[in-house]
Every structure is written in structure tokens, then in C-alpha cells.
């Protein structure tokens, strides 16, 4: 028997991207633009299947809008999912909240509309891991010791040393590899984030604590995601982010304390359902994983990164 999601419920499907090339190698990725592995693509396909099954069982439309970071691993994840949904993603970089174009079809009841707007923002990017980016987690653990390593990784105020962009960012369009000893580098910001750099109100980070991720993400959540949900009376949306950006969303939506957030770990590629009450200012109702057993096992693996070898 099919159940129906109550009409007052807005459903957010939150997802950490599928496994990336650097997740697989146990390397701090941050703003390095790592692609998905084959396992990561399979995780994206399986996530789409779980969401589709959930929507069908609860008489809920598939997500009508999607959100990703500006990093390729989230874009590849959502594109793979859209392929499973048989939807055509319409990608749009958001660098100004007042310049969003959703198309005439958005918000209509047309079940035959196969297009889905995908809004991409740097505000959903992974936490910037400063000089730890591109470094193997066991090596960083050895250098800093367990207590400082875990404080910087998990505490709300923990912050790595800043990145030296002269050494750890690609300096020109056709640069290959590295002559500075850094095997993995950030993309050139003037190219990758050209639109953001044209908006002088945007200051891109060189290192971040989780508090700073919450601070830069919250305006997008309030002024875009939740505003559009209200404006178009959306029943569901899909947000593909990163470990730290998903943790930040949960902290804001659920009201998790600064101390308790350090105990929240987000596994790759397992959809998390967050229900909000439309009749009460989109207030948090509840959250649950669509594959809770796998989520528990893999969240524990996330917590232990650096201490144990990745499978």
C-alpha cells in the first residue's frame, strides 16, 4: 500500500557526493577538484534508485530542483542521478542571489517536464582544508598528533593552517602536474570561479573552520533554497554537497549545538531525508537515512579516516 507524505511537509534529500579519487586515497580533498571513482558513480546511481523508490512509496514527486557545489564531484553525482531519474539537468552557477533563472516550466504541475534546474554555488563547497589539502590523512595525523588532528577535523572551531595559493593552486590554464612538490592542486580560481571573482562581495577562503562553513552557507540556504521552496510550494528538492557542507546544513536546520556537531559524520553516497514543516516556517520535523545500516557503518569509517586504511 502506498503512503502519502503530508502536504505540509517539504522533503530535502541531502547527499554527500559519491566516492572521489582522493576519498579513495585517504587524502584531504577540500577545494581540489577530484572526480568520482567508478564506485562513486555507482553510489550515485544507487542513491537515485533509493530516492525514486521512496518517492513512489510515499506518493511524492521526484525532486523538482537540485543544488550542488562548484566542485566536479558533486556535479558528476547529480548528473548521474538525473540520468537515472530520466531528467535533463539545467546547470546554472549562482554568483548573485538576484540573478537566478529557473525557466517558465519550473513550479508547474506539468508531469511531462523532463528538465530540472541545478543551481551550483561555491557556498556548498567542501570546507577549505588550508595547507592540509592534498596531504594524506595518516601523514597529517602523524605530524599533528591525535588530539590536535581530531580537534581541527571535528571541532566546530578547529581550523587548519592557511593554504599557500602560490604553491598549491594551478597558476595558469594549461599547467600540468606540479613543480613545487604538491601532487594535487586547487583549480586556478580566476578560471574556475570567474563569475564569483567578478562579484566583489565574495571573498573565497584559504582555510576554514566548520563555523566559517556554516557562516558562508547559511545565506544561500535562507535566500535561495528555503525561499524558493516557499515561493513555489515545492514538495521536494535534492542537495548534493560534501561532508562539511551537509553537516553545516544539518546544524542550521536541526539546531545542533556547537559541541554536538563534532559527533556528526556524513558517509558518501547515502541519501538523508530531512522533513520540514511548511506550515511552521519550514521548521525541522525529523531526519532519517534511506539506508540506515550502511549509513551507520560508513559514518564510522569517516570518523576513523587517517587511523585506518581505506577499503
Curated annotation (Swiss-Prot):
Location in the cell: Cytoplasm
Site residues, Transition state stabilizer: 242
Binding site for substrate: 16-23, 29-30, 73, 126-129, 137, 153-154, 243-244
Catalytic activity: (2R)-2-phosphoglycerate = (2R)-3-phosphoglycerate
SUPFAM superfamilies in alphabetical order: Phosphoglycerate mutase-like
Enzyme Commission identifier(s): 5.4.2.11
UniProt entry keywords in alphabetical sequence: Cytoplasm, Glycolysis, Isomerase
Pathway info: Carbohydrate degradation; glycolysis; pyruvate from D-glyceraldehyde 3-phosphate: step 3/5
SMART domains: PGAM (SM00855)
Job description of the protein: Could be non-functional.
Membership in a protein family: Belongs to the phosphoglycerate mutase family. BPG-dependent PGAM subfamily.
Name the record gives this protein: Phosphoglycerate mutase 2
Upper classification of the organism: Eukaryota, Fungi, Dikarya, Ascomycota, Saccharomycotina
Amino acid at each position: 500500500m502506498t503512503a502519502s507524505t503530508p502536504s505540509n511537509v517539504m522533503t530535502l534529500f541531502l547527499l554527500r557526493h559519491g566516492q572521489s579519487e582522493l576519498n579513495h586515497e585517504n587524502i584531504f580533498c577540500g577545494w581540489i577538484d577530484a572526480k568520482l571513482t567508478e564506485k562513486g558513480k555507482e553510489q550515485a546511481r544507487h542513491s537515485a534508485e533509493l530516492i525514486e523508490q521512496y518517492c513512489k512509496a510515499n506518493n511524492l514527486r521526484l525532486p523538482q530542483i537540485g543544488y550542488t557545489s562548484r566542485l566536479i564531484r558533486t556535479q558528476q553525482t547529480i548528473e548521474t542521478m538525473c540520468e537515472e531519474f530520466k531528467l535533463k539537468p539545467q546547470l546554472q552557477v549562482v554568483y548573485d542571489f538576484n540573478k537566478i533563472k529557473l525557466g517558465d516550466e519550473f513550479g508547474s504541475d506539468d508531469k511531462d517536464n523532463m528538465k530540472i534546474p541545478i543551481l551550483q554555488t561555491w557556498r556548498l563547497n567542501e570546507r577549505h582544508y588550508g595547507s592540509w589539502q592534498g596531504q594524506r590523512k595518516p601523514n597529517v595525523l602523524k605530524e599533528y598528533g591525535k588530539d590536535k588532528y581530531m580537534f581541527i577535523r571535528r571541532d566546530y572551531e578547529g581550523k587548519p593552517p592557511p593554504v599557500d595559493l602560490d604553491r598549491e593552486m594551478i597558476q595558469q590554464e594549461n599547467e600540468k602536474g606540479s613543480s613545487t612538490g604538491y601532487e594535487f592542486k586547487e583549480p586556478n580560481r580566476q578560471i574556475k570561479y570567474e563569475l564569483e571573482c567578478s562579484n566583489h562581495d565574495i571573498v573565497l577562503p584559504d582555510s576554514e573552520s566548520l563555523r566559517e562553513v556554516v557562516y558562508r552557507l547559511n545565506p544561500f540556504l535562507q535566500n535561495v533554497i528555503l525561499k524558493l521552496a516557499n515561493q513555489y510550494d515545492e514538495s521536494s528538492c535534492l542537495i548534493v554537497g560534501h561532508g562539511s557542507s551537509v553537516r553545516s546544513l544539518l546544524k542550521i536546520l536541526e539546531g545542533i549545538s556547537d559541541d554536538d556537531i563534532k559527533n556528526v559524520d556524513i558517509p558518501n553516497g547515502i541519501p538523508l531525508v530531512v522533513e520540514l514543516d511548511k506550515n511552521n516556517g519550514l521548521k525541522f520535523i525529523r531526519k532519517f537515512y534511506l539506508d540506515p545500516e550502511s549509513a551507520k557503518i560508513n559514518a564510522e569509517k569517516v570518523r576513523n579516516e587517517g587511523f585506518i586504511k581505506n577499503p
